[in-house]
């Protein structure tokens, strides 16, 4: 009897098994929402919305209508009457949770979601956070760092409210955070860090001043953060962590589109460092050729042009990508899928750590960047050979400057361009 029953049970196809894997991931992510108590993680609730909804979108799954409506309504209650989004209803508005809330609403898409953002009040909040030295405060009397610059500039760019007043001196502040290693720190004098490096680089691109950074040295620093375990570390001599698949991998993805500026800086540097002009300097710069550019700083744009910078985010992913990946994309996919992935859903820092919403979001974002890193256009389907595992592993493409799914970004860009 048992043998007969077993014989009648159909063997699942490869496609069915792959679909079950995707469904288990999506089910796990939905369960994360269902199991969050009302008072849990109250100061980062917009981040929980972003991490979870962005992960679902990356997996190519639609958002449940009730979940979408509840999320928009909740984020409306987090929106401060004077602009910006707080970590929860009635709390202080904060640039980080503003970024998370706006990215969530963009990912949900649709008029109700996008129109819920009070752009005028939000602009006023950003102006209040802007500092004379070019930096931004995260909140009233809060810290001033590169993360604040990125979250403000990113939100202003995607909402089509970026202007000269918000841009003024931002490039100077970020430039002062580039360290002797090449990466960027959170503030002047601190240690280079993967998260701040992505934030600073992305912000400089969005304000049209990326040529002021020492890009060859920055590239040197980032590519050497990919460790023998195949993942990325956040700082020199630290352990690899799955979340840096996006923070460092995203920085490399941005640099991949800046190859012409990198080539120009290296060519210009070679004119300064010669045997006759600087023999002592040349002796101590044997490590890599990009070290020769450490003293080069292009002036960039002294006065920003609002009509140009408002379209930088859109134009950045409209151009064809000329160079191949600048990191080992297959190796990073191996780390994400084999080391960071939990067998029953969710992703983590590394084996032995617990899965969580944050790492699930940024591991998946990094995986998407890897999969499309060989494509000339950001939404061109990659060849199967550059996608580790079955082709059903392929995620949705993201906009590398904003970390939102590409088609949702385009919808938001069209919506806000008409306002």
From Swiss-Prot:
Where Zn(2+) is bound, by residue? 241, 243, 359
Q: Which SUPFAM superfamilies match?
A: Terpenoid cyclases/Protein prenyltransferases
Q: Which GO terms describe its molecular function?
A: protein farnesyltransferase activity; zinc ion binding
Which EC number(s) does the record attach to this protein?
Answer: 2.5.1.58
Q: Superkingdom of this entry's organism?
A: Eukaryota
Family annotation (InterPro entries): FTB, PGGT1B-like, Prenyltrans, Terpenoid_cyclase/PrenylTrfase
Keyword Metal-binding attributed:
yes
Q: Which residues bind (2E,6E)-farnesyl diphosphate?
A: 193-196, 235-238, 244-247
Q: Which family does it belong to?
A: Belongs to the protein prenyltransferase subunit beta family.
Q: What name appears for this protein in its UniProt entry? A: Protein farnesyltransferase subunit beta
Source organism per entry reads Pisum sativum
